[in-house]
Each structure stands twice: as structure tokens, then as C-alpha cells.
Amino acid sequence: TPAVSLMYALKQKVDSIMAEGLEARFARHAKLNSMIHAWVAKHGFKNFAPEGYQSKTLTAIDNQDGKFDVAGFIKALRAKHNVLINGGYGKIKGITFRISNMGNETEQSIQELIDQLDDVIVDFK
């Protein structure tokens, strides 16, 4: 028996993507990604991925050789704002943290996230 509800969900999502238009969606993701990259630079971080290999929907941030308390930052962000970002995984756990701007995120939602990141990071610099 196929998972009919999943097929309906997929159709709805594809319809919403097509209603926005692929080029518009790609441009929105690029704009949101540039907002995250500006935040990264503002706080003296660097992208983990080299230029040319960076995603437009997810930013992996280098942890400055382990000088930044990624686990503490993530915990404080969640406690204060109920926001969850990823602290990396496998070999890069703790030496990166990741911020997503994919899906249906908007300039407003990313700006809210940036404001929350700014609110918490002052305790970790």
C-alpha cells in the first residue's frame, strides 16, 4: 500500500514551489544565504567550505580552531529563543556550526534568526 498522504504532501509542496517559480526560489535562497554570510563575516567567522563549494541553502561556519564554545552557544540559543542550529556531525562536530536558510524561510524569518544569534553571541565573545 503506498503512503497516499505522503504523495499528497509531495504534490502540495511541488505545487507551492512551482507557484513561486524556480528562478524566484533560487534567488530568494541566494539572498537569504547572503544575509547569513554577512552575519558570519560581521562576527569574524569564516565559512567552513571553500569558495566555490558553498551551499546556497546551508552555511557551515568554521569554529576558529575550537576557540568558540559551539555547544554552549547552541544551548543558550535554544534556551533563550527556542531556536535550534546544528553543531556539525562526525569529524566536524564542534569545529563547525550550521545555519540553514532553505525551504520557505523569508527575509523576515532570517532577520529574526540573525537578531537572536546577535542577542546570544555577546555572551560568547
Regions found by a protein language model. Give the residues of each.
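Structural signature of PLP-dependent enzymes
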Residues: 1-34
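Small/polar glycine-rich anion-binding or flexible loop at a beta-alpha turn
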Residues: 33, 52-59, 90-98
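PLP-dependent aminotransferase class I/II
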Residues: 16-22, 35-51, 65-66
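A common structural junction motif
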Residues: 77-85, 119-124
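A short linear hydrophobic-aromatic micro-motif
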Residues: 44-48, 83-88
